[in-house]
Each structure stands twice: as structure tokens, then as C-alpha cells.
């Protein structure tokens, strides 16, 4: 879909908040989820499947679509990439048996700030 088509889709979604338009936006930006998941998959040392990362990222995409302020002068792709990445990392943290606080203490100890 071209830029004009995306703009029209966004305007339709904003005016109606229709699930149908939201689903079209999800399909339109699904490739962005795959891109972010692929980048994270290269750097994560966990035994997490790529398809799982994509699944976690879809939740981030849905959240980004629901919360995006189209009136601001920000590209959706930029905003959504951060939300998608955050959703993936949040799910991975939930699966980890070491609490986030312990990681914070470990990093502080390693840097000598503890």
C-alpha cells in the first residue's frame, strides 16, 4: 500500500475506531514486526523462537495502533518500532527466572557502582 492509502486507512480508523480498519492496519504493518523481531533474534542469547518473538511483537503493534496520536508530526513506524521492541523484551523478561531487580544489582556490581 502506498503512503496515500495508509493515510486514508489511518483517517478511517481514527474516525471510526473500527476493528476492521484496525485489522487492516495490523496486516499493513506486520512486516515491521518481522523486521524488529529479526533484529532482536540476532542479539538475544535466549532460546526463543523467531515466531514467538513475532507473536510478542504483534501485541506491541496492536498497542501502538491503539495509542498512536496521528495528529502529532511523528512517523508511525518510528513509534511502533519502539513499542514492538518493548513488548518483545517484556515478554522475554517475564519468561526469565531471574527478576529484573537482580539484573540491576548485577550490572551495578559489575560496573563498580554497587
Task: Tell me what each language-model feature is.
Residues 1-98:
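Alpha-helical promoter-recognition and RNA polymerase-docking modules of transcription initiation factors
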Amino acid at each position: 500500500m502506498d503512503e496515500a492509502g495508509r493515510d486514508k486507512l489511518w483517517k478511517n480508523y481514527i474516525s471510526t475506531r473500527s476493528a476492521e480498519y484496525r485489522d487492516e492496519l495490523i496486516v499493513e504493518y506486520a512486516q515491521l514486526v518481522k523486521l524488529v523481531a529479526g533484529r532482536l533474534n540476532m542479539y538475544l542469547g535466549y532460546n526463543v523462537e523467531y515466531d514467538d518473538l513475532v507473536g510478542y511483537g504483534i501485541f506491541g503493534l496492536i498497542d501502538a495502533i491503539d495509542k498512536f496520536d496521528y495528529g502529532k508530526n511523528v512517523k508511525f513506524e518510528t513509534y511502533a518500532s519502539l513499542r514492538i521492541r518493548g513488548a518483545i523484551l517484556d515478554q522475554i523478561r517475564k519468561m526469565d527466572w531471574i527478576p529484573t531487580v537482580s539484573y540491576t544489582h548485577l550490572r551495578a556490581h559489575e560496573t563498580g557502582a554497587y
